[in-house]
Amino acid sequence: MNERDVVSRSILTKATGFLASGYTHSLNPYAGCAFSCKFCYVRELPIQRFKEMEWGTWLELKVNAAEVYQKEIQKLRKKEQPVRIFMSSATDPYQPAERKAGITRALLETMINHPPDFLLIQTRSPLVTRDIDLLLQLQKVCDLRVSMTVETDREDVKQIFSPYAPGMKLRMNALKKVKKSGISTQVTIAPMLPFTPEFPKKIEGMMDRICIDTLYLGDGSLGKTSKRLGMPELFEKYGFLDWYDKDIHIKAIRYFEKFYPSSMIYLSQEGFAP
């Protein structure tokens, strides 16, 4: 991994695309992502397309993120503007480098004194449990939700699509711990990958909400980005082509509704909304 520290002039990015319907800003403590998921839409964004290094091989650590956040939110508050933050849209705030760098933790510490109105933390990492102490303080001063991506319950499937990301059992156990501490949680099945019939039961008791999203609905281009990333071929190679159906979300929702009330289950964009 090619890592380097960077000094950012801005850390709050005005929300665009599907985030704009509920959020005012996105916040990415890092640029790049060590998890290097094969289906990640960020691979097709300018931040990566103009890089000479492959996605997953480079990382920029925004070492002054907390300081810049404080300045920016103070300016927004002076203008009496709402602040609803999605963290993160183009990286994982709890990827391996965070364990030592502590950039996300420093941001949370700053947010306790300068809170947004709403914060959603989107991650694939069990490292989020390290910061439960801060999250408990933060939820007293702002609306907070921790959303854990659990795109399948099959470790063999995870190894195909995201071999460098944390294991599914580790993620599930971490979210259970966050939920047990009293923090609002969400299981995000995104992008939905082939899973076992027992998947709904395996996530029982670890979340307040479920968000289901697919490569077709969730890549921001109705499947075009996923196609460019070679997902149809990858699904076909491993015998998963039936799971690549553009209407697979309908079957998934109906199946999960056998285990959970429909009021708990959200689809794609609505599942990420505050």
For each feature predicted by the language model, list its residue ranges.
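Conserved strand-turn element in the central/C-terminal portion of the radical SAM core barrel
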Residues: 164, 174-197, 242
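A general structural detector for well-ordered alpha-helical segments in enzyme core domains, enriched
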Residues: 69, 103-107, 131-134, 167-174, ...
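Auxiliary Fe-S-binding modules of radical SAM enzymes
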Residues: 2-7, 13, 193-274
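Surface-exposed amphipathic alpha-helices with a cationic face
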Residues: 136-140, 172-182, 254-261
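Structural preference for beta-strand elements that scaffold enzyme active sites
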Residues: 84-86, 118-120, 143-147, 184-188, ...
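Active-site beta-loop-alpha junctions enriched in small/polar residues
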Residues: 90-92, 124-126, 149-153, 190-192, ...
